[in-house]
Amino acid sequence: MRRATQLFGICWLLCLLVACGESHFMTDASYRSRVEQDFQQKKALMPQGELFAILDDASLSTYEQEALEFLYAYMPLADITDYPGEFHLMNIRASQRAAEEMPWGKNIPEDLFRHFVLPVRVNNEQLDSARVVFYKELKDRVKSLSLYDAILEVNHWCHEKAVYMPSDARTIPPLAPVAFAYGRCGEESTLLVAALR
């Protein structure tokens, strides 16, 4: 009996250590609580189906869980229904990777990262995997630059990829101007924001 109690105690301590070692996406507990409430309200609007099933994945880190809840709390309803949770998780992991690997990534204030880097949507474009594709293409080009110079370099890269051409069509996704080598004003700005993220 004593051995079972010791084993239980050791397992409990290990679980506690693992849980304490995980980083939060939102370090401010009161803000985290507000996001959780907003997420629960959004979830209540959409009770049918498995729209939030990704959050049941036990392998998610605390950071990923909180980032998903943040995105779901504030994204348009159509982005919840039109794109699977795995898509949003892929983008969370890609943004976290960039923040960890770029020398200035850890210096981005948490609130700026949360509201201006993490979100996928820029405009009314269809969402795509631009964040992953652009990171692979841009990381070596900007990794040794200051944040200021990296921003300028990404802007130059966008100009290399696409030039302005007017059209009346809906805003195309960020990968499209690269493929077509042109885009409208909104498409070029969407390309730049997606590349900067």
Where are the model-predicted features located?
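Active-site neighborhood of thiol-dependent amide/isopeptide-bond enzymes
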Residues: 140-197
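Bacterial N-terminal signal peptides
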Residues: 8-17
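Short hydrophobic/aromatic-rich motifs at helix boundaries and adjacent loops
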Residues: 5, 126-127, 163-166
